[in-house]
Amino acid sequence: MVKENIKAPHIRLPSTDNTEYLLKKSIGNFVIIYFYPKNDTPGCTLETNDFNKLLPNFKKLNCEVYGISKDSLESHIKFKKKYKIKFDLLSDLDKKVLKKYKVWGKKKF
């Protein structure tokens, strides 16, 4: 996990809006980026639906929301359509961003 007041690692990933998302384009804005393991699983679906329900509150604060997982863009599009998700999901197939943010790797208990 990235620590507070530390520059966020670069993000450049394909998005469900058919563009490439670049974190640097959001400089000066509030941004929530949440990571999740897999589309359409119980915990990940619950988390995504919670962000979706709260999206109007985040928008009032000029805050963007993005979800990132290792799922394909096709999987993200189906997931987004099924649950009527109103924000973009980003696909990190090679897990480079997930690893930069230290949210992917062997579990340590």
Task: Annotate each predicted stretch with a short phrase.
Residues 1-109:
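Chalcogenol-based redox active-site neighborhoods
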